[in-house]
């Protein structure tokens, strides 16, 4: 993590180093939380100088930094440090934030007030740039960015200076959630739940509703759930804000957030609201809703390769399901669907269909289904020829 240690294409190496650093700090935290907290600060200081020259266009490194800091911040916040020690830490973090070239340290700025811990420190860092920020936000003729604005808002919030925070935000020409979230939280901490909900939800009604949507939705969702309005929270904010790198991850995210709701219903709601039904096959299959999975498998956007793997994996434990999935895969291949399909995919799918049907004594019925598919004159010629060849081999073997 030395300055300039990573070159343009070193994103993967940098991410691995972050993982190692996080592991080291967590290990130390079990025995010496103060030293571990200082490790978090040292890491924060080194991130920008070390990663400055890396190509971050994919977003992978930024996400990794964000996750790392969010995971480590509790160590820094909860460390049993006295006021003098924390004052030193805050100066170091403030310097790192000011030097940060791409806002890597945003998670630290967001929780700066919590890191400060002591009232005097919260007020000190809230007041330092208050006049400058007030002047910058009052000048609507020019745009002025103040690097310490977020940490200042965090300190105002944690110091309990809620009305002052709201008055400051009211000066801004544009409303963006990365700052407005402090105002929403300030209203909520005063016990004005409905006002906080309206404040946050109002940001979804302007032209910038897509930026920061998930953060706004989660805030509103939290209020409604606290009020016992789970259905409203789910329909208005939970379902639209489901997130994950895969369709299965999106479903699991919602199931975890709404343990009181039927998991099957959540899956069906996601499919209906997000579309691309065929893409949900793997999620439905893994969730063990096989009837839903079969419905997904029949859709034109289902991936034949995924269906073929499922036919293989389920041939023993769910042979009827495997047969149907394999037949859908063949139908898609005949229609020319799939990513770089090969005639060998037909061979594999047919093999899984026949193997699964043999376990239930339905080989003849499976063969008739294959013949029905082979009767499609409009099918891809190469795929069709391969299917007919496979059928001939089966019939020859039966004979």
What is the predicted role of each segment?
Residues 1-399:
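Eukaryote-biased, non-catalytic alpha-solenoid scaffold regions
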């Amino acid at each position: 993590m030395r300055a300039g240690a990573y070159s343009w294409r070193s994103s993967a190496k940098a991410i691995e180093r972050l993982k190692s650093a996080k592991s080291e700090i967590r290990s130390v935290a079990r025995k010496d939380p103060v030293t571990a907290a200082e490790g978090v600060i040292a890491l924060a200081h080194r991130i920008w100088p070390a990663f400055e020259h890396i190509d971050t266009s994919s977003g992978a490194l930024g996400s990794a930094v964000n996750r790392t800091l969010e995971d480590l911040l509790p160590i820094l916040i909860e460390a049993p440090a006295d006021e003098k020690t924390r004052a030193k830490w805050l100066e170091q973090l403030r310097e790192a934030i000011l030097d940060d070239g791409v806002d890597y340290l945003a998670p630290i700025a967001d929780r700066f007030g919590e890191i400060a811990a002591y009232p005097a420190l919260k007020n000190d860092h809230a007041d330092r740039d208050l006049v400058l920020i007030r002047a910058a936000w009052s000048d609507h003729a020019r745009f002025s960015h103040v690097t310490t604005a977020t940490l200042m808002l965090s300190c105002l919030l944690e110091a309990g200076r809620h009305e002052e925070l709201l008055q400051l935000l009211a000066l801004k020409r544009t409303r963006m959630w990365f700052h407005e979230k402090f105002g929403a939280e300030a209203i909520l901490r005063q016990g004005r739940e409905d006002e906080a909900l309206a404040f946050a939800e109002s940001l979804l009604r302007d032209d910038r509703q897509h930026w920061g949507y998930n953060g706004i939705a989660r805030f509103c969702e939290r209020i409604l759930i606290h009020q016992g309005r789970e259905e409203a929270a789910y329909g208005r904010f939970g379902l639209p804000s489901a997130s994950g790198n895969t369709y299965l991850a999106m479903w699991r995210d919602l199931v975890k957030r709404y343990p009181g709701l039927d998991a099957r219903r959540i899956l069906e709601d996601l499919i209906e609201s997000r579309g691309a039904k065929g893409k949900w096959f793997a999620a439905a299959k893994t969730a063990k809703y096989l009837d839903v999975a079969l419905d997904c498998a029949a859709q034109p956007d289902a991936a034949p390769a995924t269906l073929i793997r499922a036919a293989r994996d389920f041939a023993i434990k769910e042979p009827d399901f495997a047969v149907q999935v394999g037949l859908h895969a063949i139908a898609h291949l005949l229609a020319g669907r799939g990513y770089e399909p090969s005639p060998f995919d037909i061979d594999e799918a047919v093999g899984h269909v026949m193997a699964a049907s043999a376990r239930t004594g339905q080989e003849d019925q499976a063969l008739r289904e294959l013949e029905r598919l082979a009767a499609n004159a409009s099918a891809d010629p190469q795929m069709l020829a391969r299917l007919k060849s496979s059928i001939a081999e089966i019939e020859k073997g039966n004979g």
